[in-house]
Amino acid sequence: MKALFSIAWRSAWNRRFTLALTVFSIALSTFLLLGVERIRTELRENFASSVSGTDLIVGARTGSTQLLLYSVFRIGAATNNISWKSVQALQAHPGVDWVVPLSLGDSHRGFAVLATSTDYFTRFRYGDKQLLKLREGKPFNELFDAVVGAEVADKLGYHVGQKITLAHGSGELNVAEHADKPFTVVGVLARTGTPVDRTVHIGLAAMEAIHLEWVGGAPMPGVHIPAEQVRKFDLTPKNVTAALVGLKNRAAVFGVQRWISTYTGEPLMAILPGVALDELWSVIGIGENALLLMSALVALVSLAGLVSVVMAGLNERRRELAVLRAVGAGLRHVLALLALEGAMVTVLGVLLGVVMALLGIALLSPWLQAQFGLTLSLSEPTLNEWLLMASLLVAGWLASLLPGIRAYRLSLADGLSPRI
C-alpha cells in the first residue's frame, strides 16, 4: 500500500498543474455547498427565533401569515386595528398572564417605529427565550423617549441623547414628519439578529401624542398642538395593531384561542407563533432548496472535471500503466492506483474548500450581520455539513474508478508500443 501511495503521489505531482485546477474546482464546489448549507441553517434558526416565549399573537381577523409578518417582522400593514377595549378584555381573561400591545404605522428613516408598553422589555423573548438587553442607556420612561435597535443605532450612528423625529407612514412612503414633537434616544438594544434590531421603540402614549391633531391618517388643517401641551390630553390608546399574549398555563392555549376567535366585541384572530413561522418558512424556504441545488450542480461539474482530467491523462500515462501491468499489476492494482489519486485530489479539494468556507464566514459574518441581520457563527460542522463532505469524498472516489476501468481495457501491447 505504501508503494502504491508513493506511485500515486509521484504521478499526481508529475501532473500537478492540471490536477491543481481540479483541486480548486472541487474546493470551490465544497465552499459553495458548505456556505449555502451554513447560511440556510443559520437563516432558519434566526427566522425561527424571531419570537419565543409568546403563546399567542392577537390581531384583527386576517391571514395568519399576514398577522405574523406585520406584528413580528414589520412587513406589510394591518387591514384593521384592534380596539383598546379588546386589549383590556384580553388582559382580564382568567387564562391570560400578560399582554403586550403593539402599535405600528410610523417610521424613522426607513426603519419601523413600534409603540408598546414597558412590559415589552421584560416579556418579549427571542431565540432560546432570551430577554432583550440594552447595549447602553435604559428603557423609555418619559413621554418622548425612544429606544432604538442595534442596527438602527449602527447604521445611523445614534447614541443615547440623540434627538430624532418620526414620520407618519411606513418604510420610505412617509406622508409627513412629526418634526414638532422630537424624541430623545434613551437606550440602544443589544443585537438580537431579529427585526427588533431594525426597530425604533416608543411608548403607546407617545404614539397617541404625535397623532393628536391627525384624523383619518392625515393632519387636520390649521390645528397644531405643541409638544409641551400634549400631556393635557388623554393619551390612552384608542386602538393598537396587535398584541403579544402570554398564558398562565400553556395547555389552555387552544381554549383561549377559541375564545378570541368567537369574541363578540369585534372580529379577532389569534395565531400560535411557532405554527405560523413554520407555515411562512414553507413558502419562503423554496429559495434555499434552489440554492442548494445550484451548489450540488457545481459539485457535479467539478467531479465531472475530475473524471475528464483523469481520462484525458490516460493517453499520456499509457506507458506508465502498461509498465505496471507488465510487472504483474492486475485490475485491482490499476483501479486502486487511480482511485487513490482521485481520493487524494478530492480530499485536498474538500480540505481547501473547508478552509475557504471558514475564512468566508469569518470575513463576511460582520458584513452579513450589518447588512441583513444574519448572524453566522464559526461553530463545529453540523450533521448535514459532515454528510455533504462525506458525499463529496465518496463521489470523488467513485468518479476516479471510471477512468481506471477504461485504463485496464487498453491492451498491454498498445501501451508498450511507441507511437510516431
Where are these regions (language model features)?
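Mechanotransmission and gating elements of multispan inner-membrane complexes involved in transport
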Residues: 177-184, 188-288
